[in-house]
Structures are given as structure tokens and as C-alpha cells.
């Protein structure tokens, strides 16, 4: 099986209600608030080290039994800039995509430097389901 690094669309960032724990020396997000500044329409989005997916895409990931992820609630808001520029856009429901898999083993994994690694099966699913504005998708060498 082949694996890929993917850098999803960044449509915003952490909102003020995001809770981050740095007590272990690493950044661990306890509660995620994603605030949109713009949106090109992808159903997988990033704000390092977190990812969110549309509910529709999360259902497809579950239907395919892809490994290395679980889903949780995320608070979604729109910035003033978003509301001014995108008056006619309704955002779908998003969920927090918590990646807990091993890179190069599971369908979704995170490297030590916080890069998202996906299997070819996951890549095919993402490409068929509204992920077309990723900053980059590159082959991961073993």
C-alpha cells in the first residue's frame, strides 16, 4: 500500500474557545473551536495540529472502515471577514477529525512533525468526496 503526505486547505484557524494543554511540553488540543476566515469548499480542513471534516465525509470514512481516526465535536464560527465576503455561503456541519493512527500503517496517521499521512485508499476517498484544494499531496517514502 502506498502512503501520502497531505496538506489540507486552511480555511481559518483556532477560535478563542480552543483549549490547549502544553503541560507535557507538546501542544495537545483539549477542545477545538475552528473559526472560518474563508473557504474554497474542501471537506477536509486543517489548523495544525488539528483537522476537521464535513459530517458527510466523516460518514463516508466510517462507511469505508478507514483506520486511525475518531470523530468529536468542534465549535464552528465565522470571522467578521468571512461574513462580509461570503454572504451567500452556508457551511455544512463539521466534525473534529482526531487522528490517532500510525503513519504508514493505518489509513490516517500523524508524523512526529505533525504531518498528516494517508493511505492510497484514504486518498481515493478524499479525492472523490470534495477534497480538491489541498496545498500539496506528495508520496511518502517508507
Name each region found by the language model.
Residues 1-142:
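Acidic (Asp/Glu-rich) sequence patches and key acidic residues
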Amino acid at each position: 500500500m502506498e502512503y501520502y503526505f497531505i496538506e489540507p486547505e486552511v480555511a481559518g484557524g483556532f477560535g478563542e474557545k480552543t483549549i490547549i494543554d502544553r503541560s507535557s511540553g507538546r501542544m495537545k488540543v483539549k477542545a477545538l473551536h475552528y473559526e472560518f476566515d474563508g473557504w474554497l469548499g474542501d471537506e477536509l480542513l486543517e489548523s495544525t495540529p488539528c483537522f476537521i471534516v464535513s459530517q458527510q465525509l466523516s460518514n463516508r470514512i466510517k462507511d469505508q472502515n478507514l483506520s486511525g481516526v475518531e470523530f468529536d465535536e468542534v465549535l464552528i464560527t465565522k470571522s467578521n471577514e468571512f461574513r462580509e465576503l461570503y454572504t451567500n455561503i452556508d457551511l455544512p456541519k463539521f466534525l473534529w477529525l482526531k487522528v490517532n493512527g500510525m503513519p504508514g500503517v493505518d489509513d490516517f496517521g500523524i508524523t512526529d512533525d505533525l504531518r498528516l499521512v494517508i493511505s492510497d485508499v484514504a486518498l481515493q476517498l478524499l479525492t472523490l468526496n470534495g477534497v480538491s484544494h489541498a496545498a500539496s499531496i506528495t508520496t511518502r517514502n517508507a
